[in-house]
Regions:
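Short helix-capping/linker turns of helical repeat alpha-solenoids
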Residues: 3-6, 18-20, 39-44, 54, ...
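Single-residue signature of alpha-solenoid repeat helices
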Residues: 30, 58-59, 88, 120, ...
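Propeptide-to-catalytic entry region of secreted or membrane-anchored zinc metalloproteases
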Residues: 143, 152-155, 167-269
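Active-site scaffold of zinc-dependent metalloenzymes
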Residues: 247-300
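The catalytic-center signature of Zn2+-dependent metalloproteases
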Residues: 291-301, 306, 311-330
């Protein structure tokens, strides 16, 4: 085993040096002896041979043997190569258990994708000080759990590393404060449009999470900078950040197939703030307009917002409408 380890060290050094002549080991020689070691079920040799041959030229057998031999890099590669969710999670867990940073980050992403934040959190905690993407995701989890000061620290770390979304998160928490419906009702009426005769449409955006207030602020900023719309009699207020339990929203609201919310709690706010239309930015769902309320999710581009804005002006749609719908509308 010592002899095998010595050979592997020499071959790995030659591989890292791209088999330059100064190392004295040619690629063909290394591959010959690595094949011999693979036949002895040497997992590290299998992984090195897989790397030398490349993904296209290597046999899956080398990757699998290396993974079975607890080579963390191979376990991660093997996990990402399978289409089976069960196998992927199994090999991600095995690789992450060896404290392999990329595997821990990948497993955290897997858990987040499947809504298992409680499993992702300890993995992100372990990698947050080493990786800006993990720091950002960990900060998001902390914020949602009410650990705002810790969240800001990790957002700051990620932002200093150049993470653009972390910078936007810090901007959002500096500009906005989440309100309960009761707190919002006690706030003074914004003076923006009360004395402005050009505000024939007074639109108030709402958000209920850090992610959605970030998106709402981005839409608000884009609208303010959009010279195409400045001549219209439309006024858009600064977004309001409501606490998470203020609105009951669902991506398939009342089985309609589109995003929607129970907006009854906003009725008193609408009377006090004098807005004629509302925009609700939610986590997920298909954009639409219903009864003077525009529903968007965090993935909707500014162009979608402008498209839906046309519905507020009375336009049905920009494409031909079917006969039955045309008869109904006209």
């Amino acid at each position: 085993k010592d002899a095998q380890a010595t050979l592997l060290q020499q071959f790995e050094a030659a591989y890292n040096a791209k088999f330059s002549s100064t190392r004295g080991i040619e690629q063909a020689t290394a591959m010959y002896y690595l094949e011999k070691l693979v036949n002895l079920e040497n997992a590290d040799a299998a992984w090195l041979l897989y790397q030398i041959l490349g993904e296209e030229g290597a046999s899956q057998r080398f990757m699998r043997l290396a993974a079975l031999g607890d080579v963390a890099e191979a376990q991660l590669a093997f996990a990402m190569s399978t289409e089976s969710p069960e196998k992927r999670e199994k090999w991600l867990v095995r690789a992450a258990s060896q404290q392999y940073l990329p595997a821990q980050a990948a497993l955290a992403d897997w858990y987040l994708l499947h809504g298992q934040q409680h499993l992702a959190k300890p993995l992100l905690a372990a990698t947050a000080t080493l990786d800006m993407q993990s720091a950002f995701k960990y900060a998001r989890l902390l914020w949602d759990e009410g650990e705002h000061q810790q969240a800001k620290e990790h957002f700051t770390f990620a932002a200093k590393q150049g993470h653009a979304q972390a910078e936007k998160a810090l901007e959002a928490v500096q500009l906005y404060t989440p309100y309960t419906l009761g707190q919002l009702a006690s706030q003074p009426t914004p003076p923006t449009w009360l004395d402005n005769p050009d505000c024939l449409q007074r639109i108030q955006p709402f958000a209920t999470s850090l992610a959605t207030i970030m998106r709402a602020h981005s839409l608000y900023s884009s609208f303010k900078a959009d010279t195409r719309l400045q001549a219209l009699s439309i006024c858009l207020a600064k977004p309001i950040w409501l606490q998470a339990d203020a609105l009951n929203c669902h991506p398939n609201y009342q089985n309609t197939g589109v995003l929607g919310c129970n907006i009854t709690p906003l009725s008193n706010i609408a009377k006090k703030h004098k807005f004629s239309h509302a925009v609700v930015v939610s986590e997920q769902g298909k954009a639409n307009v219903q009864n003077g309320v525009m529903y968007l999710d965090i993935s909707d581009a500014y162009s979608v917002f402008v498209h839906e804005l046309a519905h507020f002006a009375g336009f049905a749609d920009e494409y031909p409408i079917g006969r039955s719908m045309a008869n109904k509308l006209c």
